[in-house]
């Protein structure tokens, strides 16, 4: 593999032993592909997939017919326009990034008499705005970035289950079947303790299941024949009964008479018939057996028995034979009857008992019964009952299994075909509908006599009979993923259905009044549904933007909650647990702690959803024991059929599995298998974990609970001022940084033309440009913008002018990335030792050096907004002329009343001056006089300026002013506008300049050395054009030269034309952008002006901040110790962090210790390289040392491909330490770490003697020291510390509010009162309960006394006493307080 431009500057040593078969796929593919499939905007209109996305939704609702059938609205196609604003503009203006959706419809009017088409009108209808996905898989809604989380829900289909013996006291298992459609009514079948089968529709009251079958048109006979085998008896004269013998059916029965065959008695009366007896009977070839008459008693007749003479029914189907009935059959001369074959073992009489419990006698009665159950209290009519039943399961408008549901359904009931109708199909029912229904005829032709409902019942009875298995609903073959596209499509369809109802009403008017399609369709419901989904659905979440990793994990999250999913309260233990099918699909580690544990999961690294929405994961194919590089994706359903080896199974040189027995997975169990049985093999050891977990080095040495915390805490790391790559990584860092979208990658290869802190200009290589376009890519970098979590998002260039970059190379770093690698924290020199009790309970001790060097300083950006509204009393005004405010308070404002950029402000400072008109009150004569003298301003406004909130100080880094259309812009707004326009102009000018330079360079190549006919500045006929001549001539006059070769003249003309059109294009683009900038802003109603001020706040590390490693080893900083007091090593290097050694053994996260050792070795090797560079070692010596470091074990590097300069740069970058990658489950082992420590000249034990910085004495035993990668988490003490003197009070109780957000007080609760009582501190207690809490009069007196310098207090009546009195009175008990005074 060739190194990319940034990779070769700092090569990470990879300790992985296993080959890299499959690169990590694009991490945001699930989101991006799903939405692309939904919009299909890059696909031409006729090539779109008609089953999915917007196209699918439109086609499922259209065409819409009027009630009379004379008018029809047909859908033709849709198109998505261009978004009016770019993503960044939407974010700053608080808009939704969306594009207009327009639908082309055709209105057809039919002629009643003639039967032809009378009139057709086509028109495009605006259907509202469709939110677009940004390139990184997010949506911008009202200016904030949001993510739509994938949902894991129960797949549609049929499921068989039992109640685990909970319903009945005997513990009997009651089986049930449930048909779950994608949309429509649920259908449940269940057994009761008496083994009758009941049906429920939509979980309503249960009815015997045969009612449903009768409603479908089945007669009792048909029902019985569908579910039972029958025995045939011949009745002869003299009450002789002969049975057509099927020997297997006798097995297990006790013979009530001697069974005789071929003259010998095979089974004696009273003996049980065994398998041996059955074999003997089969051998003897007996086909009929004479049985005694009473053998019939208790058998159930399978059909109606009719007297041949009179036509009278002697016995109905499902009648149990008694001696009397049997006799009547003999008397009537019936020759043959069939009875149901049932036994206690594996042929239960369930359907028969159900039929006996069913009181209905006909199809109509059954329909009425179902109608009564669904619509209790409504009088049933024939039509209503038939209609209701038909719409429940048999119309595609109301019921849809979806392709997934149909596939799952068919496979579960044992059919081979995965396709089928979206409704429940029953041949008998559709045949009964008659020829009126065209759709029914098509279905009957296609699917014949099959019946979905009968198949489900058969399977259910089979399971009850002990022949089948119930389903595991937590199996990932029974749960599927719904992504953005699918959810948006469902919402869109719901909106369209609402539109359809309105259109149906108006279509009848269209005939009479000649309306156009636009007047028929009101798109508001669609727009409202979409807006509601993206803005406030439970699964549309505010993006977690702490750092690049948290963005990626948020987009790969899979939630079982949300609409149509589970709820926290209802979810049991099984749903949350790790399931064997999670392997390679869902991460077993990364999930939140707390109430959501196991309900919110993360996609595994190689997992993806297939076309049905089931998660599948990658495997290598194994053929006859030889491992191939062919990769196949298997879903959980397919996987259980195969034998799958693990990624670390030993493979010899020729690719054959090396061991005799190999650890494998088969049918969700771990087993050992021989090499020839293995069919697949994992592609990578990190296949089973998610992105966040795969970033934890030595994960295999950590306990699962701590690994979970480690994976979760990496997402909370705050980007530091200077990112520092981890010395010990896992090799995933570059992938995550690239796919997160925070780094700028080259879209096309080329040469860097220009770089500054704000943008990078690349001149694209000729082979990557299309003809006629300027071969220039301009990358604007984002500087100091606020993320969703108020952290700072800023990019800085990595390239220099003249660098050659290829497509996909990193051009600029973003937050928490270092040279294109994810860098969430800093490498710290740590020692595991106690230090004066400051390590108690996982506290962490740090050196002052970290604060001094700003290692963990982070910048947080706060956005403060000031809104000037139009009020009843007049409009608010943003101004620097504020009443009763000192000059010094206004010193940071400009003439418009807005703070300068760069001003350092602290709590309480004015950022935007604003005055609001006050209500008119009755003026005194003096005030009238003052107003007459000083004008209006004196008293009629109050100061409502935007001030810096408490506990915040920082620097103003940006100000934005938004002005309503039609309101005059102030000076500040105009200045901001001018800057913006200048910036756009500069970008376009640069692009144009590079394009022109390029064109003239091509012209020069074309003209120099060719013969001219004539030209300006005395170029004669036949003269040769020289370079010097062209340099003297102004460029625009080059086109006046006439050449002898006509082809060259044509090329000259073509270039001139190209330049002109390009200039026009640039000018047009500039005008467009300028218009956007100068236009007024679309503000919410009543708002005249909005000013947004961004403050940058620097947060240094301080005691109380949360600090953590990557192994779940978290703690709070307890103290910052001067550098000179920290323990130091032999060479005088003080350690930077002291961790508690007790944090390791009980937590079992040994990974942190291994990381510390390897980090120390990595740093030591960097030190050695640094020394070699100082001694100016030659290239060969450096190459030799590097190959010793890189190539002794693990993956080999191609250092020989580097040039000398590249080698020097690499060594220079390695001085701070040689970065190592120890992939998850395939990392460095103890021997390799020791080798590195030895190579770096460090003790192989990883321990060294430390000396106390205060006394200089050596500690009494060697201490583990090394480099650990540590993160500062976004739980900063600055956001939590809070104090109050006076502040707001609660309205009813008059007690201070609680919490920092309300500027509340500290609660002095029940227990604290007990403490004071125990001390007997009566006066302190009184003060706490009265003046410091809810004694209103006492509070005001106290304030007055303090002002007067008198420090006494008088306690009055606490307000809570009055509240208590009122509460007692509300119970109807009068209570009065009698005062002595």
Swiss-Prot record:
It catalyses: RNA(n) + a ribonucleoside 5'-triphosphate = RNA(n+1) + diphosphate. GO terms for cellular component: DNA-directed RNA polymerase complex. InterPro entries: DNA-dir_RNA_pol_bsu_ext_1_sf (IPR042107), DNA-dir_RNA_pol_bsu_external_1 (IPR019462), DNA-dir_RNA_pol_su2 (IPR015712), DNA-dir_RNAP_su2_dom (IPR007120), DNA-dir_RNAP_su2_hyb_sf (IPR037033), RNA_pol_bsu_bac (IPR010243), RNA_pol_bsu_CS (IPR007121), RNA_pol_bsu_protrusion (IPR007644). GO terms for biological process: DNA-templated transcription. Keywords: DNA-directed RNA polymerase, Nucleotidyltransferase, Transcription, Transferase. It comes from the Bacteria. GO terms for molecular function: DNA binding; DNA-directed RNA polymerase activity; ribonucleoside binding. Its EC number is 2.7.7.6. CDD domains: RNA_pol_B_RPB2. DNA-dependent RNA polymerase catalyzes the transcription of DNA into RNA using the four ribonucleoside triphosphates as substrates. PANTHER family: DNA-DIRECTED RNA POLYMERASE I SUBUNIT 2 (PTHR20856). Belongs to the RNA polymerase beta chain family. The RNAP catalytic core consists of 2 alpha, 1 beta, 1 beta' and 1 omega subunit. When a sigma factor is associated with the core the holoenzyme is formed, which can initiate transcription. This is DNA-directed RNA polymerase subunit beta. It comes from Halorhodospira halophila (strain DSM 244 / SL1) (Ectothiorhodospira halophila (strain DSM 244 / SL1)). The gene is rpoB.
